[in-house]
């Protein structure tokens, strides 16, 4: 009797299925890791902006009227932040509406004694929640009550 060496179709299909499952699992894990990394960058960016805003306020007794991503935060004699960070790409993590999904959104209150800095996260990251979060001089919180001008 003549024996053939090799794999059967069933054995090949099982191996292909296992490879497909492992590939899918690694791709999902990779995407999840990337979202976490972008969220960590967002939280770090907001912390840096809050520190710069406080330094500005301590010297000028008012928060700046606006912040422009890519610009700087400075007064006539001091640079508090050389580059206002931009939201990491893709900017739509967290399913935030309008401008929040694109860049950080800053507004000063009418008196200049407070501000709102809205940023979005793609996933829950204790103590923050996925979606819109808002920083003020006193706290950072998850929110659905967004400041006016936020689309």
Ranges and model annotations:
Residues 125-129:
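Short, solvent-exposed loop/turn elements at domain surfaces
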Residues 1-4, 12, 44, 74, ...:
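Compositionally biased, low-complexity segments enriched in small residues
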Residues 24, 30-74:
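Conserved hydrophobic/amphipathic alpha-helical signal-anchor segments
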Residues 54-123, 151:
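Extracellular/periplasmic head regions of type IV pilus-like filament subunits
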């Amino acid at each position: 009797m003549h024996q053939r060496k090799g794999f059967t179709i069933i054995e090949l299909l099982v191996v292909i299925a296992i490879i497909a499952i492992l590939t899918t699992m690694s791709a999902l894990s990779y995407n999840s890791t990337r979202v976490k990394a972008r969220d960590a960058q967002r939280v770090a960016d907001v912390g840096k902006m809050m520190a710069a805003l406080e330094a500005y306020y301590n010297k000028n007794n008012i928060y700046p009227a606006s912040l422009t991503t890519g610009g700087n935060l400075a007064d006539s004699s001091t640079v508090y932040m050389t580059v206002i960070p931009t939201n990491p790409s893709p900017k739509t993590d967290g399913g935030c509406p309008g401008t929040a999904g694109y860049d950080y959104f800053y507004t000063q209150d009418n008196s200049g004694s407070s501000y709102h800095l809205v940023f979005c996260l793609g996933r829950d990251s204790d103590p923050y929640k996925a979606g819109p979060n808002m920083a003020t001089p006193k706290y950072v919180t998850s929110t659905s009550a967004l400041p006016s001008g936020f689309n």
